[in-house]
């Protein structure tokens, strides 16, 4: 960036006490500049590392520092004496005032008062000794900075709550630009107006440009114009501050105590921390970007660590105790270990200069602060991953200060425990977990459990670290640097403790602190988790932000993420929250994590209210305190454990709770048990969330903590189905472990939780949650016995797994265990858990005392020569079954037994089957012998063996598979395993000419066999991958490749023997489990593979039942009076009244028919008149003949005699007009219809026949739609009528259709018996196809005449369809209204397997007056069927009309309630041949569809 002429007026946040001498910041800068000038003249040499403004200095190349410079630097370093004073040799280089050097453009330095040589303050290597010789030259003045209020709070916050570490941070944002503040001098005794709490938020914006870096030694300028002065070169210090928000000011190793004067002036450490001010109500509110007073320089980037360069006195300073800095508003409060201020010290510029000199002298690393990313290992000057500026003020021995949490600021010594005094406005907070008290305005505040002495630290709303500059007294307290939010002021030396420090619990290995991974635990058990200061089962989230060059925008205040959900609106005033809580930075922080778990996903047992504690009493009796913040109304569900002491107590309480001991809280205000559920899931951290910042120096998991948490979660005294949650800090990459009752620690990974779940209140109280033993007590004896047997099976299976060398995490084993868990249900307690089964299995196998009672019977089927016997030998490991490569080795069914891993296995070896269709009879005989052996030794597993290298898609094995299914039943495939031998065969070439991959080859061959089995069983649903039989590969060749253990392996690396045995064991265990839990259900072979039992089609059977049927009548030649038709009786009666019409035909004049030659001579009108007269005479003749027939039948009834046998033939059943169908002409069978084509292949002449002489009528059935004209006749139809015992007329009609695929048979047979003149009974037997099954129908009905023109029929039927039986009844009534109109109504019901169908029919028949002479008639019918709640309506119309003398039109139409139906029109004519032109219509439609196919497909389009 361009250099600016900035004139910072120096101020000091560290004020020297009155009476002390010191020098101003300007004097120090001037002295450094003069030293640089003297160096150029060969005089004085700078005592600090030279920070050049060149690119080399920025990049940190150490090559630029010559040996001469280093030696000169060492020579000119201030000599540090034991008391911490600076030797007089340095006086000369620091006395004179200096202006801005001219070498590079630098901000002008306002000259201040000169500082004496003896006033220069340096830090000694020991923490205890700090020079007392530093004083203030002018005691009557001090510097005060009037800083205008920063209006925009967002300028002091890190944008998006994160800091970019992986890129060089260029300060180009206008929002982060700070303004140089005016400086005016005031008396030293004056206090700041804001009680010493000044704050300047931001981050150190390190620019890779270094044009404005002062070249002189000891004086530096950042890209923002900040002046950095290294005041004393000391020994090298290695301060490993690896977390964001960490600032080390002062000694990192020595025992000096850097104190602030008694005037309680403020030490400014603004790390994105807002200042807390007072509002009108006397409560605290976070005031971001307050006017900062007495600040010499302002760091303008968004996460800067600011320390004023005010005058410090060199006095004994003890390490400021780590201060737990308050998080952002909306989070849990932290313990503030109040540290004493720095009574005496040095200016901040001197501190920086000394640290720079140390780094230069000890490590020779020229890693410039302005050079972008600063290495963590550099001594003296550092940047953490949040962009915080870390400076070592003293050169001491190499110390690794591992402050492993964000928001940690290290200022001064760490060795001793001092309490930072506050002005008393902030309530004391101890151990980060404090009870909730009542503030002045009714607001909630934290009351410290333990009295802290003179706390001076203040908490700000932004989650930043601020160190008060008030005077601090040395006290003893425990230091845990590894906790989040800890501020370390002073030096941090490993294993060095202050002499007067009486606390032995100080961490002595600060440099290598094992940071326990914060685990978030949510329980649904019946115990209450309580720590000494904590009264809840809470979530402690691991605060391990990913650090590295690839990390993007991690939030500074990310040490503890809890509280407010809204990251943008989380600025709750201090007036409403006197304790500070962190906010969950989601959305803006770590934007690359898409699967963040919001706050509402984090289940906790306690929730805080900012506007007053509001406890909602749940139905379970447990209180839930909800958050009612002013700006964020989201409920927080998390409790934070931040300190190591709290974590230890928490783990101890977990141990107690896990053993069933209820822990109670000592906090009176929040003593309710608030354990929540997370839906039976256990959430753990992903392995990918490992922090890479510390480079392996610290352990990510505290194994003891993790073990205790897991122990409490996985059944150690917890209630059934105990659930446990371990989550990462930001809720990303969660994995769930569902532990249903009885499964304990069974882990089941789920997909990352992406969507937030709604907040869940407590739904289970302690009274409803029972322990495992109580659950087991509540089980009935029968259930206990089932669970015990199930547990025994589980133990057996686990022992078998152990013997096979497989683990429970194996894919097949995991599926079996999962199914066992589902069958056990959630009622299983700890006694029947998976952990108990695993433990027992391991113990049983280790001891070897308990015998494994498990046996296996395996039936081996397959074609000849596929390797059945060789597979048996390979499994048993011995040459037991004889094998022959050139012939059949197995000629009969035999049993072969052996022991494998302690399991007795019995094989049923069978002879090879043949796949040819002609050999299936031989296969059936062999399979009958197999069936006999199966009755003696029922097989548990069936191995269908085939070769892998001979599979084709021609389905040649289908006849064989169908024979197996027919002989042994479909249940034979229930526990079948497809075993493919010769598995080491090379795959064939694929379509591209290259060999197929092995996996593709195996998959194709497996699918072929599975598909064949599905077709053989007869249900294509077996081709569903979830229902297919498992496939196992086998290679029996002695030269098969082996692994190191000598076990045969396949080309894919699989050990086939153990895999096949595992499949067998798994199917046997699952089969035993099913029979164990459901012994009452009989085996239904129809339900094998999930087959749905087909219910009979009741609507179809009902419609078949409701049809009207004519009763057979005796032929006239057998003396039967078949006059049982009401219509015929009516006609007989009517004929008596029409006797006068009998003479009408006789009264006609004679009529001479004309010949064709004569008709041709007639005109059209004459020809028409002739035909009308001819038709009229023919009709009169037919009427006369009909009446004579009726009279004869009437005489037959009266006389009981046989009349007219010789002169009249009996009109058959076809003449019965009551069915409404046109009467058939009683003529012999005519010639077949014209063929569809007139080619030579149509050999219709072959089927011509003469008039039959017997009652058996046989004719072929032509398939007019077939493609084969020569052999298009694929069926035969036979009809026969006879009289049984000369009394019972009977008819039978059978039609058989057979082709290559189907065989259909249709049979209608009836026999009737008369009951006097008014009644008749008929019985019938029908066979017809219903789908692929044959339905056998036995029916019967009785018809009787109750009125003159009314006839009633009552009937029923029984239908046998497979294993189903359907019964039905019907009622029918027929009434004749005159001679033309007939009404027919029928109703009935059909019932099968508790299912019923109801139906009704109504038909109206209309005939012409001369019926049956005239054939014109019409019928209209309505049908209604109700089945399974569905109502089906249908309408049918049939009409037959004569058009002209020789033309007829037949119309048939049907429509149902779903608006679907059909219309059929038939036209026949022997006069109008032009009617054949109508065939052009379908041809034209076909042509139109071929031209425009889209026109017809639009309405069927799915779019």
Curated annotation (Swiss-Prot):
Residue segments, region G4: 981-984
GO MF annotation terms: G protein-coupled receptor activity; GTP binding; GTPase activity; metal ion binding; protein-folding chaperone binding; ribosomal small subunit binding; transmembrane signaling receptor activity
Transmembrane segments: 21-37
Modified residues (Phosphoserine): 71, 210, 281, 288, 448, 461, 589, 609, 630, 632, 665
Annotated spans, Disordered: 1-210, 298-338, 429-464, 610-633, 1203-1222
Record-annotated AIG1-type G domain positions: 853-1087
Quaternary structure note: Homodimer and heterodimer with TOC33. Part of the TOC core complex that includes 1 protein for the specific recognition of transit peptides surrounded by a ring composed of four proteins forming translocation channels, and four to five GTP-binding proteins providing energy. This core complex can interact with components of the TIC complex to form a larger import complex. Chloroplastic protein precursor such as prSS (precursor of the RuBisCO small subunit) interacts with these complexes.
Record's protein name: Translocase of chloroplast 159, chloroplastic
Gene symbol of the encoding locus: TOC159
């Amino acid at each position: 960036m361009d250099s600016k002429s900035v004139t910072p007026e120096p101020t000091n946040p560290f004020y020297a006490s009155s009476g002390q001498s010191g020098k101003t910041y300007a004097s120090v800068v001037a002295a450094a500049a003069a030293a640089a000038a003297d160096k150029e003249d060969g005089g004085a040499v700078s005592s600090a590392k030279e920070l050049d403004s060149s690119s080399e200095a920025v990049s940190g190349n150490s090559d630029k520092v010559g040996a001469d410079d280093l030696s000169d630097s060492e020579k000119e370093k201030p000599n540090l004496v034991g008391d911490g004073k600076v030797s007089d040799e340095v006086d000369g280089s620091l006395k004179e005032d200096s202006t801005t050097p001219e070498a590079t453009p630098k901000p002008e330095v306002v000259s201040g008062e000169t500082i004496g040589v003896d006033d220069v303050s340096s830090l000694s290597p020991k923490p205890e000794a700090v020079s007392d010789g530093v004083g203030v030259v002018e005691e009557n003045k001090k510097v005060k900075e009037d800083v205008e209020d920063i209006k925009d709070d967002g300028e002091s916050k890190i944008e998006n709550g994160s800091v970019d570490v992986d890129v060089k941070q260029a300060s180009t944002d206008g929002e982060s630009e700070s303004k140089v503040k005016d400086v005016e001098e005031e008396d030293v005794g004056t206090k700041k107006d804001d009680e010493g709490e000044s704050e300047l938020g931001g981050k150190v914006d390190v620019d890779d440009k270094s044009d404005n870096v002062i070249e002189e030694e000891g004086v530096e300028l950042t890209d923002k114009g900040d002046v950095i002065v290294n005041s004393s070169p000391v020994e090298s210090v290695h301060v490993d501050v690896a977390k964001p928000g960490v600032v080390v000011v002062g000694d990192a190793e020595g025992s000096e105590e850097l104190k602030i004067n008694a005037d309680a002036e403020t030490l400014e450490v603004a790390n994105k921390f807002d200042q807390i001010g007072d509002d009108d109500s006397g409560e605290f509110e976070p005031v971001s970007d307050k006017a900062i007073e007495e600040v010499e320089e302002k760091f303008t980037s968004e996460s800067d660590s600011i320390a004023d360069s005010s005058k410090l006195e060199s006095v004994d300073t003890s390490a400021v105790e780590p201060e737990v800095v308050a998080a952002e508003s909306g989070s849990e409060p932290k313990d503030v270990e109040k540290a004493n201020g720095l009574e005496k010290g040095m200016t901040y510029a001197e501190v920086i200069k000394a640290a720079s000199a140390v780094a230069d002298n000890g490590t020779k690393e020229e890693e410039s602060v302005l050079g972008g990313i600063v290495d963590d290992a550099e001594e003296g000057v550092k940047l953490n991953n949040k962009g915080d500026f870390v400076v070592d003020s003293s050169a001491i021995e190499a110390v690794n200060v591992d402050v492993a949490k964000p928001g940690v600021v290290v200022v001064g010594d760490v060795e001793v425990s001092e309490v930072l005094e506050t002005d008393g406005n902030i309530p004391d907070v101890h151990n980060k977990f404090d009870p909730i008290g009542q503030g002045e305005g009714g607001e909630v505040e934290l009351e410290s459990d333990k009295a802290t002495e003179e706390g001076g630290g203040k908490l700000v709303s932004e989650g930043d670290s601020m160190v008060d500059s008030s005077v601090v007294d040395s006290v003893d307290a425990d230091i845990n640097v590894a906790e989040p939010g800890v501020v370390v002021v002073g030096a941090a030396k490993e294993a060095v403790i202050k002499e007067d420090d009486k606390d032995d619990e100080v961490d002595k290995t600060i440099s290598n602190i094992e940071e326990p991974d914060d685990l978030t635990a949510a329980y649904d058990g019946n115990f209450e988790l309580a720590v000494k200061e904590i009264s809840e089962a809470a979530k402690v989230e691991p605060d391990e932000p990913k650090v590295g060059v690839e990390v993007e925008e991690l939030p500074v205040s990310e040490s503890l993420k809890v509280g407010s959900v809204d990251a943008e609106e989380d600025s709750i005033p201090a007036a409403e929250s006197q304790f500070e809580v962190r906010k969950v930075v989601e959305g803006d922080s770590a934007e690359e994590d898409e699967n963040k778990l919001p706050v509402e996903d984090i289940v906790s047992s306690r929730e805080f209210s900012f506007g007053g504690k509001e406890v909602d009493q749940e139905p379970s009796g447990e209180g839930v305190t909800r958050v009612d913040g002013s700006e964020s109304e989201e409920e927080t569900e998390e409790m934070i454990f931040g300190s190591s002491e709290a974590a230890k107590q928490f783990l101890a309480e977990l141990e107690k709770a896990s053993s069933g001991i209820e822990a109670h809280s000592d906090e009176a205000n929040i003593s309710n048990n608030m354990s929540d559920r997370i839906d039976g899931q256990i959430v753990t951290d992903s392995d990918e969330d490992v922090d890479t910042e510390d480079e392996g120096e610290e352990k990510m998991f505290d194994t003891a903590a993790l073990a205790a948490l897991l122990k409490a979660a996985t059944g150690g005294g917890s209630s059934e189905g105990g659930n446990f949650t371990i989550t990462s800090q930001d809720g990303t990459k969660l994995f769930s472990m569902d532990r249903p009752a009885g499964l304990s620690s069974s882990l089941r990974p789920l997909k990352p939780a992406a969507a937030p779940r709604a907040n869940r209140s407590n739904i289970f109280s302690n009274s409803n949650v029972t322990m495992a033993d109580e659950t087991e007590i509540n089980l009935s004896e029968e259930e206990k016995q089932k669970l015990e047997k199930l547990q025994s099976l589980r133990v057996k299976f686990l022992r078998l797994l152990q013997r096979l060398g497989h683990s429970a995490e194996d894919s097949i084993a995991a599926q079996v265990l999962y199914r066992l868990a589902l069958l056990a249900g959630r009622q299983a307690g700890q006694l029947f858990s998976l952990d108990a089964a695993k433990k027992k299995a391991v113990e049983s196998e280790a001891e070897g005392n308990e015998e494994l009672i498990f046996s296996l019977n395996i039936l081996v089927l397959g074609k000849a020569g596929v390797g059945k016997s060789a597979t048996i030998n390979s499994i048993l490991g011995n040459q037991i079954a004889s094998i022959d490569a050139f012939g059949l080795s197995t000629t009969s069914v035999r049993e072969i037994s052996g022991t494998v891993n302690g399991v007795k296995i019995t094989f049923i070896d069978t002879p090879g089957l043949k796949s040819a269709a002609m050999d299936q009879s031989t296969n059936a005989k062999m399979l009958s012998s197999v069936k006999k052996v199966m009755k003696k030794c029922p097989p548990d597993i069936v191995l269908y063996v085939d070769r892998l290298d001979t599979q084709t898609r021609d389905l040649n094995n289908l006849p064989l598979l169908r024979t197996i299914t027919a002989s042994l039943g479909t249940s034979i495939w229930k526990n079948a395993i497809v075993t493919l031998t010769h598995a080491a065969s090379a795959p064939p070439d694929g379509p591209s000419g290259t060999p197929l991959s092995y996996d593709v080859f195996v998959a194709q061959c497996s699918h072929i066999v599975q598909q064949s089995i599905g077709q053989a069983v007869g249900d294509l649903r077996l081709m569903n991958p979830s229902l297919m039989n498992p496939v196992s590969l086998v290679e029996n060749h002695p030269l098969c490749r082996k692994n190191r253990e000598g076990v045969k392996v396949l080309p894919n690396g699989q050990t086939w023997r153990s895999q096949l045995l595992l499949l067998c064991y798994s199917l046997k265990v699952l089969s035993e489990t099913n029979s164990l839990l459901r012994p009452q259900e009989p085996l239904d072979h129809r339900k094998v593979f999930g087959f749905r039992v087909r219910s009979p089609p009741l609507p179809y059977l009902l419609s078949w039942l409701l049809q009207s049927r004519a009763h057979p009548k005796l032929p006239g030649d057998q003396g039967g009076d078949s006059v049982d038709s009401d219509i015929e009786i009516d006609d007989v009666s009517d004929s008596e009244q029409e006797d006068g019409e009998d003479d009408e035909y006789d009264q006609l004049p004679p009529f001479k028919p004309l010949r064709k030659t004569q008709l041709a001579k007639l005109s059209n009108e004459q020809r028409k008149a002739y035909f009308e007269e001819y038709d009229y005479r023919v009709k009169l003749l037919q009427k006369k003949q009909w009446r004579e027939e009726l009279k004869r039948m009437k005489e037959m009834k009266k006389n009981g005699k046989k009349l007219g046998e010789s002169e009249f033939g009996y009109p058959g059943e076809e003449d019965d007009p009551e069915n409404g169908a046109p009467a058939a002409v009683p003529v012999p069978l005519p010639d077949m219809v014209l063929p569809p084509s007139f080619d030579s292949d149509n050999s219709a002449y072959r089927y011509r026949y003469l008039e039959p002489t017997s009652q058996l009528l046989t004719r072929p059935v032509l398939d007019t739609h077939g493609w084969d004209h020569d052999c298009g006749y694929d069926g035969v139809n036979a009809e026969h009528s006879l009289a049984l015992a000369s009394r019972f007329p009977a008819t039978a009609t059978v039609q058989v259709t057979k082709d290559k695929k189907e065989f259909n048979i249709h049979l209608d047979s009836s026999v009737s018996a008369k009951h006097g003149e008014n009644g008749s009974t008929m019985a019938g037997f029908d066979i017809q196809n219903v789908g692929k099954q044959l339905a056998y129908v036995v029916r019967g009905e009785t018809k009787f005449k109750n009125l003159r023109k009314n006839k009633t029929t009552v009937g029923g039927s029984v239908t046998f369809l497979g294993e189903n039986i359907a019964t039905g009844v019907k009622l029918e009534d027929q009434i004749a209204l005159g001679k033309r109109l007939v009404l027919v109504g029928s109703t009935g019901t059909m019932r099968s397997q508790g299912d019923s169908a109801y139906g009704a029919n109504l038909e109206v028949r209309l005939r012409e007056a001369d019926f049956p002479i005239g054939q014109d008639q019409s019928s209209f019918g309505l049908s209604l069927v109700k089945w399974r709640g569905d109502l089906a309506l249908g309408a049918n119309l049939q009409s037959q009309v004569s058009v002209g003398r020789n033309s007829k039109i037949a119309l048939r139409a049907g429509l149902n309630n779903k608006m679907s139906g059909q219309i059929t029109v038939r036209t026949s004519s022997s006069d109008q041949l032009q009617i054949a032109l109508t065939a052009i219509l379908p041809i034209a439609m076909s042509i139109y569809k071929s031209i425009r196919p889209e026109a017809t497909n639009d309405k069927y389009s799915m779019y």
